[in-house]
Structure formats: C-alpha cells, structure tokens
C-alpha cells in the first residue's frame, strides 16, 4: 500500500488529513497516512503555549501566539468550505474573533472524524532523504528519546513558516538595559503597561503587537520601519519613524534623527522558511513571498513530484487556501491529477512568478492570491465557496484599516459559505479586554 508522511499537524497538516478523510468517505481507497507533530496536541501555532525558548524536552518552542490575540482579518476569508462557522457555533458570530474561538473552530472540524489516531505527537522529524523511489523519514519520540526510521512513497511538508524567527543585530543591543525580544516570544502585552516600547517592523506582526501594547496601557509605542511605513492613522501615543540605527543606553536612535527613550524593543522582523530536517536536494529555499519558486501550483516540488509543500506562501488567504492545496496534493498522490512534463511545469511556475513580480499594492496582491486559489479550487472536488466574495471582503477590510486602524475589527461581513452576516460584536475591540470564548459568544 502507498504510504504518505505528513509533517506537521497545524492548519496545513490538518487540511491534508481532512482531504484524505473526505476521499475515504466518498468510497475511495486512500493511502496509509502517518502524520508527525513535535507538539503534544494538534493545531500548530493556534495551540497557544505560555512557554518561550525551549519546551520540556529541550526543543525550540514553535508557538508564536500570544494572550489577547484577536483575528486581524475577517474570519469569513478563512472559512472552511466544508465546515462553516454557523455549523460549528450554531449561529453567526462576529467577524473578528479571538484566538481561542478560532482554535475551537479549527479543532471542531477535525474532531468529527478519527484523524487523531493518524498523528504521532511529541515526535520530531529529524531527517528526510530520497533514494530508489522512496523517502526515508527519521524521527525522534521526544518522550522516550527514541530514534526511528520509516519508508514512505510521498511526503507532505506542512510545518508552516512562522515559527523560526529572523533576529537582526543592531549596534548597542548588548548594552541595552531594557527588554529585547522577538514577537515569536511575545506572550502578554500587560508586561509593557506604563512603559515606552519600540516595535521594529512594518507588517502584520508589528501592526498587531504595537496595537496590543497600546491597548493594554503602554506609555508610548514607536514603530520603526525599514522601507515603507504602514501609514495608518495611529492613535495618540503611537507613531512610525524610519529605521533604527542603534541603541545608546536606554535610547533608540533612528536614521531620520528621531530619538526615543525606551524600556523595551520588540523585533517584529519576520520568520525564516526553515527546514533543517530536509536533505539539501529536497529543501525549499525562499523568502516570504506570494509565489515561492520551485513549487508547481504552489504545492508540488519541481524536482520531485512525490514531495509537496503546503502553506509556504505569504498569505492573505489561509485555511481555505490550505484546503485547496491539500485537496490538490491528495489528488496528485492518488493519481487523479497527472503532473505535466518538466517543460510545462517550468512554464507554469514562471507564469505565476512573473505576475507576482509586477504586483504593486495590496489590492493587486489580493487579486493575485485569489486567482491562484480559485485555479487550485477548480482542479479538485473541494466544496463550493464564494472566492469572489472573499476577494471583495479582503479589499473592504484593507480599506477599513486605512480609515481607522483602531475600529476595523468592529465591522462585520458575510460568509462565503452560508451567506449569513456576522453580528457586530457586543464590545468594541479597543474595550474588549476579555478574549475568552465564553465572553465572546455569550455576553
């Protein structure tokens, strides 16, 4: 029997497991599936941990979630086509839920089946190599410190790319008397109440960590950008300045001449695509971009069609895009989709990369990824979902942020699956200090 290894049981890995489960429910004979995950439970990044640094077994903690995290994009844009929010919660819910609510939704879909039995938890994959038409996967049982090997016909890498932080060095860091941390280790904005905070970065992490610090009482928040400012209308106590040059004592000196006394520096400087367990000839090497190179349809490894990577893109679309990728990967593995010859694959990859290189703004990026996801959707039997409505919702969301970065989470949108419109949340985001599922749903 064909054997498939799935590495990671976060959203991408769960999409892969779900895709095979659905095929089996449809009466198809599926391969033997083994999923590996280094954590104690499923959910990937959404499985919040208080830990930073190392876990109890000495491995790096993969989690980057923090307390009081609320979705920074409309939930409707990530809705599963085969499992709506309405079905899970029994009613429409507001469009911007906190982490616990989304985690509950993610698990609700996979708990319906017997998927957990296919996952080896507390298991770290240490090496994947390919020879004689097969993959050899070496893995370590962390609890028992036992090394094992197994042979697979296909490998799906679904580890994500938001767990290994990129940490730059600036002059003066060693002598800085305050707190320096990467957003990967950020857990609680309450730590910075009454303090002056410098946040370095200009993408979603910088935006949200800065807003969290402001919301929970930071004295001031100064955001340092390298290339282009986010440019939002920040509330009093927040500002953007150009590029940190150095730290001198407790002062942050920026290249535009701005000087800011600070108690803490939070590096929101992104993450690395990091696959130390993959042999060199199988390893994806890319920055954070909408169409990584070497991946046919953004999924199949160009040099070995038995290897797939899920969720490696910079992302507007998330969960339903991961599903479309997983359904596509499944159908390649099960022979329902035939990969073309090398020349056609090269041509297809170059087409998407060329289009990506011409993108100039967020609206164009949304269009690009929507068209990519729609194309994948049409290639499999993934259930119907309104990607045109998702496109429209993304663009409205972007414009709401430009209008008011503090209130965009108070808007509501329609589901691309059921059409129901989420109610306005009972408490404006800026005033909502309790992020529990119970309070969110029932107050």
Swiss-Prot record:
Positions with a binding annotation for NADP(+): 70, 72, 170, 202-203, 205, 226, 409
One GO MF term: NADP binding
Record-linked Pfam families: FMO-like
Cofactor: FAD
EC numbers, comma separated: 1.14.13.148
Alphabetic keyword roster: FAD, Flavoprotein, Monooxygenase, NADP, Oxidoreductase
Positions contributing to FAD binding: 37, 39, 45-46, 72, 125, 315, 318
Catalytic activity: trimethylamine + NADPH + O2 = trimethylamine N-oxide + NADP(+) + H2O
Protein function: Catalyzes the oxidation of trimethylamine (TMA) to produce trimethylamine N-oxide (TMAO). In vitro, has a broad substrate specificity, oxidizing many nitrogen- and sulfur-containing compounds, including dimethylamine (DMA), dimethylsulfide (DMS) and dimethylsulfoxide (DMSO).
Family statement: Belongs to the FMO family.
Protein name: Trimethylamine monooxygenase
């Amino acid at each position: 029997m064909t054997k498939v290894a799935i590495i990671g049981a976060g959203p991408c890995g769960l999409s892969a497991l779900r895709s095979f489960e659905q095929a089996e429910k449809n009466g198809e004979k599926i391969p033997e599936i083994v999923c590996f995950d280094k954590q104690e439970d499923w959910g990937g990044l959404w499985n919040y941990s208080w830990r930073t640094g190392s876990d109890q077994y000495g491995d790096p903690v993969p989690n980057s979630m923090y307390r009081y995290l609320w979705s920074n994009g409309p939930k409707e844009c990530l809705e599963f086509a085969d499992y709506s929010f309405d079905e899970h919660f029994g009613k429409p819910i507001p469009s911007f839920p906190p982490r616990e609510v989304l985690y509950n939704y993610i698990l609700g879909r996979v708990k319906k089946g017997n998927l957990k039995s296919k996952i080896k938890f507390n298991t770290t994959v240490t090496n994947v190599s390919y020879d004689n038409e097969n993959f050899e996967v070496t893995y370590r049982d962390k609890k028992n410190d036992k090394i094992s090997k197994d042979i697979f016909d296909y490998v799906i890498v679904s580890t994500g790319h938001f767990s290994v932080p990129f940490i730059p060095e600036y002059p003066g860091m060693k002598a800085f008397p305050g707190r320096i941390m990467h957003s990967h280790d950020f857990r609680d904005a309450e730590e910075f109440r009454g303090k002056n905070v410098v946040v370095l970065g200009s993408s979603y992490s910088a935006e949200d960590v800065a807003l969290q610090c402001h919301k929970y009482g930071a004295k001031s928040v100064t955001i340092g950008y390298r290339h282009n400012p986010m440019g939002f209308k920040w509330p009093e106590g927040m500002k953007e300045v150009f590029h940190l040059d150095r730290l001198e004592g407790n002062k942050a000196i920026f290249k535009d001449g701005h000087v800011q006394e600070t108690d803490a520096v939070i590096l929101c400087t992104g993450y690395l695509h990091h696959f130390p367990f993959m042999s060199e000839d199988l390893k994806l090497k890319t920055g954070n971009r909408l169409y990584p190179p070497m991946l046919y349809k953004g999924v199949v490894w160009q040099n070995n069609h038995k290897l797939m990577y899920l969720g490696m893109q910079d992302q507007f679309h998330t969960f339903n895009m991961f599903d479309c990728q997983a359904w596509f990967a499944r159908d390649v593995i099960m022979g329902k989709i035939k990969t073309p010859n090398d020349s056609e694959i090269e041509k297809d990859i170059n087409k998407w990369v060329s289009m990506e290189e011409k993108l100039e703004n967020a609206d164009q990026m949304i269009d690009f990824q929507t068209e990519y996801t729609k194309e994948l959707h049409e290639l499999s039997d993934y259930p119907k979902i309104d990607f045109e409505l998702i496109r429209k919702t993304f663009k409205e969301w972007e414009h709401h942020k430009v209008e008011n970065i503090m209130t965009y989470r108070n808007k509501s949108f329609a589901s691309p699956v059921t059409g129901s419109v989420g109610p306005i949340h009972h408490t404006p985001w800026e005033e909502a200090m309790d992020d529990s599922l119970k309070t969110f749903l029932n107050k």
